[in-house]
Amino acid sequence: MSDHRQLRVRFYPTQGQWMCVVQRLGADGMPEGEDAVSAVGATKEAARDAAIASTTDQAVIEALRAH
């Protein structure tokens, strides 16, 4: 199992939908670079499913499944 403690999963409401964003965090807890993945869906679950479908990074997938 991958260590996904250095990833932050967030959900934001936007224009009647939900956005799911996964960010990589540095040692200081601050986001590093661009988002690892982001996706939009009608529900949080749909946004999460879309984010999972848009990446092959196992650590990101595990972090998304944990939320």
Put a short name on every predicted segment.
Residues 1-21:
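Short N-terminal "domain-start" leader segments
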